[in-house]
């Protein structure tokens, strides 16, 4: 292709891009006008317009629903939007048009640069023709290249043969000096490994109280890495590691012999003995000779820890406690009414639970009252003028522990005395009877039930049904003339 044809193609491309830019600019102007009209349409209800009837004919008309606009989305798809939404859509399309215009301008610049490059090259070629410049030409033979490639492949094979010869030279028998050096290196390596294994064992035994600096100082003082082979014999070392866990004392002795801690050996050898003695002493102190050991069992007979939060403790009836109580108590014959009075010693006037101490005081007081055979006959007696002189059951128990109860407790029963224990017991008895007699009020079920869930025959008298009365016409109803004339006849 000549340079002139190339220039023509570049010029045609530039013209096409410029035409496309002008089309985009025209659409941009149309969008601006459309935005102006959409902004003014909602101002009036029915604006007047000229409706086109073909290319030349128009007639007057009015727009309705100015806020509803159909927008073409593409491929004959439309969507209803308000005027504000359509303005936003048009502005976005306007931005896309600006970006496409900028891209076309950049492409035009690129084409112009190519045109300038081609002109420069064409000028250079014309100048070289006049300067008598000769091109270099060489013959090409594929056979020669193949031979060269074969030679290149043979070179790395030779290098591999040389490496094999060197390896065979290394496999020659070693001298005595080399053997000694290798043995020394192996021994040093074995000693280092032994030292590391000892350090790991010591660290595992020490646990959290392990300090690397202190242990390394002691270890370096006691242990000679360059020692004789007798101290670090492989057979002895392996035998020590293969012993069972049951022989702890023998393992400790061999371990300290290997480490060289001779000073600490007697202390640690007696360590287990001291621990056993301490445990024995603690057991003797904890379990005295005259003390009982209490154990707790579940329903299946298994021992249970009472401190476990997942276990509920249910106190059983112990035989020993019953025997002790029988020795302390005195046999007292009680009537049925007296037994009912004892029932509610655990409740106060308000129905709240009493503490264990208060219940014990009341029971002791009641038994002492039965021993002294206090009369329960109701005798009228004037009320006491001073309420402060009356004594509560607790104060009676505290003050009359040494003296007689008869000096403070009146023999006759007084209903008005609030501090009398007999009145308190009777009130509790009444409260218990009232709670037992309480019944929950249930609403009475209806007598006539429409359907109870059972199948019943139609002609039965189980459900009384009233006959439906016939509708009666209203008194003031108007009749037609035709109907009234027929009735009169």
Curated annotation (Swiss-Prot):
Keyword tags: Nucleus
Biased composition (Low complexity): 157-168
Keyword Nucleus set for record: yes
Biased composition (Acidic residues): 227-265, 276-298, 315-329
CDD domains linked to this entry: Prefoldin_URI1
Biased composition (Basic and acidic residues): 169-188, 215-224
Cellular component terms per the entry's GO annotation: nucleus
Biased composition annotated in UniProt, kind: Polar residues: 396-413
Example GO BP: regulation of transcription by RNA polymerase II
Subcellular location: Nucleus
SUPFAM superfamilies found in the cross-reference section: Prefoldin
Skewed-composition ranges (Basic residues): 480-489
A GO molecular-function annotation: RNA polymerase II complex binding
Pfam families named among the record's database cross-references: Prefoldin
Superkingdom of origin: Eukaryota
Region Disordered, residue ranges: 141-188, 200-329, 396-415, 434-489
Annotated family: Belongs to the RNA polymerase II subunit 5-mediating protein family.
NCBIfam families given in the database record: prefoldin subunit alpha (TIGR00293)
The protein, known as: RNA polymerase II subunit 5-mediating protein homolog
Organism: Dictyostelium discoideum (Social amoeba)
Primary gene name: rmp
């Amino acid at each position: 292709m000549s340079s002139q044809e190339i220039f023509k193609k570049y010029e045609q491309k530039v013209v096409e891009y410029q035409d496309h830019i002008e089309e985009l600019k025209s659409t941009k102007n149309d969008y601006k006008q459309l935005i102006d009209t959409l902004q003014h349409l909602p101002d009036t209800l029915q604006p007047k317009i000229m409706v086109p009837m073909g290319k030349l004919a128009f007639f007057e008309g009015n727009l309705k629903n100015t806020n509803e606009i159909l927008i073409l989305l593409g491929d004959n798809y439309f969507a209803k939007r308000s005027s504000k939404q359509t303005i936003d859509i048009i502005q976005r399309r306007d931005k896309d048009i600006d970006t496409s215009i900028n891209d076309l301008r950049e492409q035009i610049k690129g084409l112009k640069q190519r045109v300038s490059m081609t002109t420069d090259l064409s000028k250079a070629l014309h100048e070289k023709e006049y300067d008598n410049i000769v091109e270099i030409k060489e013959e090409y033979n594929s056979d020669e290249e193949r031979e060269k490639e074969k030679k290149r492949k043979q070179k790395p094979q030779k290098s591999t043969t040389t490496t094999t010869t060197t390896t065979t030279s290394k496999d020659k028998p070693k001298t005595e000096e080399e053997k000694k050096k290798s043995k020394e290196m192996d021994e040093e390596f074995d000693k280092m490994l032994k030292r590391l294994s000892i350090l790991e064992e010591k660290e595992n035994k020490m646990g959290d109280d392990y300090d690397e600096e202190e242990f390394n100082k002691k270890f370096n003082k006691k242990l000679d890495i360059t020692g004789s082979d007798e101290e670090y014999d492989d057979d002895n070392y392996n035998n020590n590691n293969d012993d069972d866990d049951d022989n702890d004392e023998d393992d400790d002795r061999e371990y300290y012999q290997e480490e060289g801690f001779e000073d600490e050996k007697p202390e640690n050898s007696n360590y287990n003995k001291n621990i056993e003695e301490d445990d024995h002493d603690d057991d003797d102190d904890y379990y005295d000779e005259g003390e009982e050991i209490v154990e707790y069992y579940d329903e299946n007979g298994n021992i249970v820890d009472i401190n476990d939060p997942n276990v509920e403790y249910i106190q059983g009836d112990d035989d020993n406690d019953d025997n002790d109580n029988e020795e302390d108590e005195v046999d007292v014959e009680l009537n049925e009414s007296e037994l009912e009075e004892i029932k509610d010693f655990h409740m106060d006037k308000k129905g709240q639970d009493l503490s264990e101490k208060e219940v014990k005081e009341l029971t002791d007081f009641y038994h002492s009252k039965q021993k002294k055979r206090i009369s329960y006959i109701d005798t009228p007696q004037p009320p006491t003028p001073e309420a402060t002189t009356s004594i509560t059951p607790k104060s009676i128990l505290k003050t009359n522990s040494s003296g007689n109860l008869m000096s403070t407790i009146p023999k006759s029963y007084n209903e008005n005395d609030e501090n009398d224990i007999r009145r308190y017991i009777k009130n509790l008895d009444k409260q218990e009877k009232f709670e037992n007699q309480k019944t929950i009020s249930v609403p009475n079920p209806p007598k006539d039930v429409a359907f109870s869930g059972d199948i019943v025959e139609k002609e039965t008298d189980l459900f009384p049904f009233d006959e439906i009365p016939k509708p009666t016409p209203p008194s003031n109803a108007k009749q037609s003339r035709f109907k009234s004339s027929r009735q009169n006849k």
